[in-house]
Structure formats: structure tokens, C-alpha cells
Amino acid sequence: MCLANRLSENNRVLLLEAGGADTSPFIKMPTGVIRLLSSRTENWAFDTAPEPALNNRKINWPRGKVLGGSSSINGLVYVRGHAQDYERWRQLGNEGWSYEEVLPYFKRSMNNERGEGPFHGIGGPLNVKECESSLPTHQHFIEASIEAGYSFNPDFNGAEQEGVGPFQVTQVARKRCSAADAFLTPIIDRDNLNVAILGRTLRNDIDGKKAVGVTYKQDGNQIQEVASKEVLVCAGKVQSPQLLQLSGIGNPVHLNNVDVECLHPLDGVGQNLQDHLNIVV
């Protein structure tokens, strides 16, 4: 959504979304997350492979299938990646991706109701505010954690991320502020922006070493679009590597096993996934 916003300032952009429009009232209301996590309309509702350490149970893995992606169905918590992760990306050769270098873009994208500071910005499209839901048990949990040796942290997006404390959320007043709300809705009427909902990308079309277009399915029809400049894959941590594999980019052995011609061998595609666990107490 953010890329569609920025790129359509000067370019013609086709935005493909496999899901539908974000019109469900459950998306707008924060407590609607309970309904969305069990939805099969706005949620891909994946299951993991059986986990040996969990008695071979499969763990439900919600992913957004709607405009705004997972930002339209998540718990609204605003916590950035750890600074050391970005620094690791830079060390691997991704120049420009250290935390110091990406922090200005985080600040530019947000309107933090705490005000402007070294780690927060104001005036941006994504509204971030304090979580208004507070119960006595919340404070009891914080106090118990401090007694157990954890430090109190009033800002997980500040100088330190470790510790215990209240988190901020992506809301405007008492409504969700998703990526679609922040970056897409304000520019939806641009003539050079085409948003195709219910358009599931089947593959990127590759010519030599370059992606030259996409093939997607919409309303039962298979459609091929040719890109005049470039193709950007923004399908999330699960379906971005899946889309690369469907396009012939990945481990040759795996692609051969699922009858996909390998156009570019790259063993790391679909590997090294890390995700956070959520435990409701």
C-alpha cells in the first residue's frame, strides 16, 4: 500500500489484491479481530506443518486476505523490528537497511500522538496512539514482571525494545488504521492507479533474468499484464517466497517436485523464516 502510494505519484501502478475490499465493520472495530482471526473471507487461515515439539499439532497462522493485508486483521499492535535485525541486514550486504538509515522512513510514515521525538514522527499517514484498553490485570502483570527481574519499558519503539510495558496501537480514535486506511484510501481516485481486488497473482512472468509482467486470475479469467518498468512482490512473509517459487525462482529440487520449471536456482527462497509467537494469558 505504501509503495502504491509513493510510486503512483509519478507512475502508472497496478495493485493486485487476492482478497476483497476492506469494507467489513469487523475490520474497522478493534474488537473485531476476534471475528477476523476465524474468518475465511478476510483471512487465508493457514496452518503450519505438524510441529514435533508440540506433539505434532498444527498451529493456526492467520494472514490477511483483504485490502490492507494482515494490517487489516491483526491486533493493531505497533512494534517495529529490532534494531539489531536491520543492522544484520546491512551486514549481509543490504546497504541502506541499517536501523539508523530506515528510522527516518518510519518517522515519516507515522503520526504518533505522543508527539515528535528521536524515534517518532508526526504528520504522516499512519496514526499511532496509546492503547485505551486497560484492566487492573494489565498493571498487575507489569508489576509481577518487574518483580521477576524485567525492566519497565514505556516505549518498545524507542531506544530499547526489551522490557515490559504498555504498547501503542494503529488506531484513529477508536477505529483501526490499517495500511489501506493510511496509504491507499487517500489516493484511491488517482487516474494512474488501478486497484484490482479479487485478483490472485499466479506467477511473475520472467524473461531471462528479469520479471517483465504478471499473470493473475480474476473473475475466472486468467489475465496477463506486461510491466513497463518493474514488478514488485509484496505478498507477505509466506506468499512472497511462494510467488517466487511459482515463478520458477527457488530450490531446483523442490520446484521439480511440484512440477515448476526452475528459471533461477536460489536455495534460500522459502527458508530461514522467523515469526513471533503470541500467547494469551
Segments (PLM) and residue ranges:
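N-terminal redox-cofactor-binding region of secreted/periplasmic oxidoreductases
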Residues: M1-V281
